């Protein structure tokens, strides 16, 4: 009985300490993970499919196709933010 009570009190103290320390972080935006440097992924209104030639079709504009595993159907998605996915030498 004493062991269960002691274990319960230890857990209660750890939970209380965790709840107390959680909001103790800084309120300033800094570092590479801050929302000032964040990117956003948004699903477009269209779906996409993979044809027999293994090319994906159905996405328009800045949208591209995302799919799971070996599926031949996917959703169109658009990324907004500061991305630089250029291939070295592709613009030569």
From Swiss-Prot:
Q: Mind telling me which GO cellular component terms the entry cites?
A: extracellular region
Q: Which domain of life is it from?
A: Eukaryota
Q: Which key words tag this protein in UniProt?
A: Disulfide bond, Glycoprotein, Secreted, Signal
- Which compartments does it reside in? Secreted
Q: Where is the signal peptide?
A: 1-26
Q: Which residues are glycosylated?
A: 47, 70
Q: Which GO terms describe its molecular function?
A: C-X-C chemokine binding
Q: List the disulfide bonds.
A: 44-63, 48-65, 59-76
Function of this protein? Answer: Salivary chemokine-binding protein which binds to host chemokines CXCL1, CXCL2, CXCL3, CXCL4, CXCL5, CXCL6, CXCL10, CXCL11 and CXCL13.
The name of this protein is: Evasin P942
Record the organism: Ixodes ricinus
């Amino acid at each position: 009985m004493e062991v269960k009570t002691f274990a319960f009190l230890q857990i209660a103290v750890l939970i209380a300490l965790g709840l107390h320390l959680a909001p103790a972080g800084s309120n300033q935006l800094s570092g590479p993970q801050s929302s000032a440097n964040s990117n956003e992924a948004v699903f477009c209104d269209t779906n996409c499919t993979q044809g027999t030639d293994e090319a994906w079709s159905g996405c328009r504009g800045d949208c591209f196709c995302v799919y799971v595993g070996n599926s031949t159907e996917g959703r169109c998605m658009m990324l907004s933010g500061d991305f630089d996915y250029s291939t070295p030498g592709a613009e030569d």
